[in-house]
């Protein structure tokens, strides 16, 4: 099993990829199980916890980035530059495992365009397209 932290700079509590099932030049399939211990559930919403839509989009983008790094290598960081066509179709609750299916639409040395869908079981929960710029992290 691949150590996700070797593929992404994100760390707890903002690492949203548990495992990668498939990663090739066209597609990534990865998973994230959201537990009741997620810090954002304390405020979104305490009486009826739901994974925020922005976290689902971040999860898709992290899955896409980790999968691309796994299949193609490289050392540059991915910086979200645009999010388009985001739609949320089903609530994701504590205990749900999300299956992310991400397609590489365009990959170059300096940018990445992907589209992804997040499923709980066979039910579509969210979908979006995004653009990432690829570059080195600024030094402090």
Predicted regions and their residues:
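Catalytic strand-loop segment that frames the active site of acyl-thioester-processing enzymes
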Residues: 12-51
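Beta-strand-rich interaction surfaces with strong enrichment in secreted/lumenal proteins
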Residues: 5, 47, 88-90
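Flexible, low-complexity linker/boundary loops enriched in proline and small hydrophobic residues
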Residues: 1-21, 132
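Short Pro/Gly-enriched beta-strand edge/turn motifs at strand-loop
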Residues: 1-4, 96-100
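Hydrophobic core residues within well-ordered beta-strands of beta-rich domains
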Residues: 14-16, 98, 112
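HotDog/MaoC-like acyl-thioester-processing domains
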Residues: 25-27, 92-96, 103-140
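Hydrophobic beta-strand-centered segment that forms part of the acyl-chain substrate-binding groove
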Residues: 63-99, 125, 132-133
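Compact, glycine-rich, soluble single-domain proteins
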Residues: 41-68, 80
């Amino acid at each position: 099993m691949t150590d996700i932290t070797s593929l992404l700079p994100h760390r707890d509590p903002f690492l949203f990829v548990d495992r990668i099932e498939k990663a090739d030049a066209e597609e990534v399939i990865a998973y994230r199980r959201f537990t009741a211990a997620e810090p954002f559930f304390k405020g979104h919403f305490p009486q009826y916890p739901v994974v925020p839509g922005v976290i689902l989009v971040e999860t898709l983008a992290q899955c896409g980035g980790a999968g691309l790094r796994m299949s193609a290598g490289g050392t540059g960081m991915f910086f979200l530059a645009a999010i388009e066509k985001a739609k949320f179709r089903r609530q994701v609750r504590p205990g749900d495992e999300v299956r992310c299916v991400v397609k590489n639409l365009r990959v170059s040395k300096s940018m990445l365009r992907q589209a992804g869908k997040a499923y709980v079981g066979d039910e579509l929960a969210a979908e979006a397209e995004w653009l990432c710029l690829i570059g080195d992290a600024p030094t402090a």
